[in-house]
């Protein structure tokens, strides 16, 4: 008989790219068409111009750009392919233009040459929410980001320097959540003379309104400490202790609502039954011999608490074992605390007022303005900066540097006591740049505390002094 081969749409396909060079296929990604990144450019595999479905009888392979790829996987943003060029120091954008019926190539890293040209890109990651950002891991351990919003034609580059000694980011992962994309980093550092590797996650912005003020985290390798964690049940869940019975006095307090015995040295205040502050603001401390239902105190009760009064635990000693020997930044109840050095896995706070604390490593957060433009007929004229107006959103702890001078933006009013928590500032803040020279045309803005700094806009007023 005669043997025949039937070719059907379900047959597997094997292609050889027709090219003048020996091209290595480095990645394949699905966009508007199937894209093949090679060592000699990017090819597209599709059925036909009228039907993109690939079958054994209908297929097309076209080379759309000669800009080579690397083995770093690209990202796709709104059907635009973004990939590192061979050498890993340029970023190419490949976009299909319906009006011109062709793929258009753009080198979007041109304005970031000074920060991207010193090392190679090893990984890309795309974060869609809350802000559209392309993250890039460099082989020297730095992290670059490109804020990328095609709808408003917005692109902005940033360099991210992580806190700690010899800090290097070795990997990144994006985990989509219901209302945002979670960004995870793997970071290596030298801690207490040894190299440590930790997995860290970026926390949420204040503007997202999902994180309490006390838990805002603007430190690296950070840890959140809660006073409630000092009293937990057998499953490790926090317990709330209540005063059991009115008219108590002396140095013993009968409690209920908790099954755990407080550790010696546990500090607390007695609130009202509804959880608000009472007239007794004394900070009590448990001593040896306490039980789950009877707490021995270091002093006599100042007044008889009401039945079912809430016992609010307070922090004084924090355990930060993963940063042994390091100087750490601290926030207590949403306000900056003096730096401390971790010794024997612990740091001791300067006060006993906080229910929540955040500890971690400081990182550099700053921005420098460009030299402002001049009129067409004033290119060689002298100019001097007069004022800087910043549009600030939910921020504190901002300092301006220029001409070897520093000026801190003040957000605390004369009616607020030093150390008293103040609200994050939102609005315009105008700063006079007094004493700035005619030859200084840039201003640096720094975050100087473990609190948020978000600058949404800058306006500079200047004067010109003739040629």
Language-model features, listed with the residues they occupy:
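Beta-propeller domains
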Residues: 1-10, 45-55
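Extracytoplasmic/lumenal domain signature
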Residues: 9, 13, 54-57, 61, ...
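Beta-sheet repeat architectures centered on beta-propellers
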Residues: 20-23, 66-69, 80, 87-289, ...
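Catalytic or ion-translocation cores adjacent to nucleophile or general acid/base/metal-coordination motifs
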Residues: 47-89
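Elongated alpha-helical scaffolds
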Residues: 34-37
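Beta-strand-rich domains and repeat architectures in extracellular enzymes and scaffolds
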Residues: 22-30
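WD40 beta-propeller blade core
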Residues: 43-44, 144
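A short helix->beta-strand "capping" segment at the edge of beta-propeller domains
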Residues: 5-21
């Amino acid at each position: 008989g005669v043997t025949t081969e039937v070719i059907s749409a379900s047959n597997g396909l094997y292609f050889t790219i027709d090219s003048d060079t020996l091209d290595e296929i480095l990645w394949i990604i699905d966009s508007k068409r199937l894209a093949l990144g090679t060592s000699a450019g990017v090819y597209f595999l599709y059925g036909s111009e009228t039907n993109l479905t690939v079958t054994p009888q209908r297929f097309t392979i076209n080379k759309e750009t000669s800009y080579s790829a690397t083995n770093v996987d690209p990202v796709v943003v709104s059907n635009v392919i973004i990939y590192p060029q061979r050498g890993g120091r340029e970023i190419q954008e490949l976009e299909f233009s319906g009006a011109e019926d062709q793929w258009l190539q753009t080198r979007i890293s041109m304005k970031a040459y000074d920060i991207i040209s010193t090392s190679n890109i090893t990984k890309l990651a795309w974060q869609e929410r809350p802000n559209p950002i392309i993250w890039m891991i460099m082989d020297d351990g730095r992290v670059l980001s490109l804020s990328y919003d095609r709808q408003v034609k917005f692109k902005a580059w940033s360099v991210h320097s992580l806190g700690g000694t010899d800090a290097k980011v070795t990997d990144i992962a994006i985990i989509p959540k219901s209302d945002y994309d979670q960004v995870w980093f793997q970071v290596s550092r030298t801690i207490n003379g040894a190299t440590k590797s930790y997995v860290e996650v970026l926390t949420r912005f204040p503007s997202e309104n999902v994180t309490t003020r006390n838990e805002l985290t603007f430190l690296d390798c950070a840890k959140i400490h809660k006073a409630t964690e000092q009293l937990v049940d057998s499953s490790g869940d926090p317990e709330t202790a209540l005063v059991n019975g009115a008219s108590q006095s002396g140095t013993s307090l009968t409690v209920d609502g908790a099954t755990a015995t407080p550790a010696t040295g546990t500090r607390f205040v007695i609130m009202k039954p509804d959880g608000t502050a009472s007239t007794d603001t004394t900070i009590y401390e448990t001593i040896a011999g306490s039980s789950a239902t009877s707490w021995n105190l270091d002093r006599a009760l100042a007044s008889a608490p009401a039945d079912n009064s809430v016992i609010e635990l307070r922090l004084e000693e924090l355990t930060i074992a993963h940063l042994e020997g390091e100087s750490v930044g601290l926030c207590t109840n949403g306000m900056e605390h003096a730096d401390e050095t971790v010794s024997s896995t612990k740091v001791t706070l300067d006060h006993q007022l906080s229910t929540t604390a955040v500890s971690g490593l400081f990182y550099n957060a700053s921005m420098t303005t460009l030299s402002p433009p001049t009129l067409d007929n004033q290119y060689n004229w002298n100019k001097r900066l007069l004022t800087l107006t910043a549009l600030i959103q939910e921020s504190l702890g901002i300092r301006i540097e220029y001409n070897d001078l520093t000026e801190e933006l003040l957000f605390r009013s004369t009616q607020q006591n030093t150390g008293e928590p103040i609200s994050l500032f939102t609005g315009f803040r105008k700063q006079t740049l007094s004493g700035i020279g005619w030859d200084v045309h840039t201003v640096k803005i720094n975050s100087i505390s473990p609190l948020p700094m978000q600058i949404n806009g800058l306006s500079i007023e200047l004067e010109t002094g003739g040629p």
